[in-house]
């Protein structure tokens, strides 16, 4: 059910976004007082010393249109659709982040800066990864630095443990 709800919201967002983007750029009707602004961009980053490649694709379209007073006290509606895709990879990992945003308001929408690829990759690069070691000097999970994650169902309840021939463990580093 939760997946259906998510899919329904995604479909609705997609339909609204397509509607917002359906008006071609530069097609203005002299009878209408519509304003639109479009921002698109692509950023790429390569850090050879860290073997990191990153890419960010984004687009944003904002439209301000005149509407009947019964639809908006201001007589205008402001709509924005934003899409972003970020990818970062290095030999030992690959991260992909994608999101879409749509808003509609009778008031002017605040200018939201586009996420910066360099700040995103800085976060990825500065995250220390625990090194696995078998030496006697390594810190054991019993000392509180590592904690086992428990498996949970969608509703948040902990799954019962079972004896089986295989197991999966997830560890989190606490600072």
From Swiss-Prot:
Region (RNA-binding): 50-156
Source domain of life: Viruses
Protein name, UniProt field: Movement protein
Domain notes: The N-terminus is involved in homodimerization. The C-terminus binds ssRNA. The C-terminus is phosphorylated.
Source species: Turnip yellows virus (isolate FL-1)
Annotated region (Disordered), positions in chain: 116-175
Phosphoprotein found in the keyword field: yes
Assembly, per entry: Homodimer.
Keywords, in A-Z order: Host cell junction, Host Golgi apparatus, Phosphoprotein, Transport, Viral movement protein
Family membership noted in the UniProt record: Belongs to the polerovirus movement protein family.
Homodimerization: annotated segments: 30-47
Keyword DNA repair found: no
